[in-house]
């Protein structure tokens, strides 16, 4: 709606700020059931070039970049101890506050520089910068790893160096047969596709023993 035109056809309309505000409130109200975990979380958004291509669940105009920003904001607004970062082939500075409207968040994420995809970076960054995290939540698409160290190895290195049994949740916004998590490690989980139940499932996984 905020773009003032449809993805299909030639329909156009005047964007009304009050409607944008109402849609924003409705989006967050839909996730009121998501409860905070009380854990320390690093929330990482993949901003690589492939995140701006294709569509999610056959919805025209809903790219992995838009979908991941929307879902990540649920966790960002719900949790009190959360650090939001962005990455591609390197860590990318991101300036987003909890009180920003969803359309503004999507716009800011869309303006970040593109690059490759290295899903190990959030763990390596946290280790290098002495960030204590009980869980890493990574939103990406189907291109999940193109770095020098596998994300599983990066998480294990973080656990070993910090002594924190951190968990890893990787959300692949585009459904395919990807897998990053070690199936033998109960502290890792892959989530595939765009699902409104994901934030609640992720919260339950983080607090589970």
Name what the model sees in each region.
Residues 1-209:
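Acidic, glycine-rich A-domain
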């Amino acid at each position: 709606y905020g773009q003032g035109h449809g993805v299909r056809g030639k329909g156009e309309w005047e964007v009304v700020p009050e409607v944008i505000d109402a849609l924003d409130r409705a989006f967050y109200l839909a996730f009121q059931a998501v409860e905070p975990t009380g854990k320390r979380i690093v929330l990482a958004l993949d901003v690589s070039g492939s995140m701006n291509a294709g569509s999610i669940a056959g919805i025209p105009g809903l790219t992995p970049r838009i979908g991941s920003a929307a879902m990540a904001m649920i966790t960002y607004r719900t949790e009190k101890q959360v650090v939001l970062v962005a990455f591609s082939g390197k860590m990318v500075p991101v300036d987003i506050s909890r009180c920003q409207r969803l359309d503004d968040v999507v716009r800011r994420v869309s303006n970040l520089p593109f690059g490759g995809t290295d899903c190990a970076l959030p763990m390596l960054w946290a280790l290098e910068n002495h960030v204590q995290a009980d869980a890493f939540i990574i939103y990406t698409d189907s291109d999940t790893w193109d770095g020098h160290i596998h994300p599983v190895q990066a998480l294990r290195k973080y656990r070993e160096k910090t002594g924190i049994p951190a968990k890893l949740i990787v959300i692949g916004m585009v459904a395919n047969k990807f897998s990053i998590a070690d199936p033998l490690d109960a502290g890792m989980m892959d989530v595939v596709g765009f699902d409104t139940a994901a934030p609640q499932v992720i919260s339950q996984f983080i607090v589970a023993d």
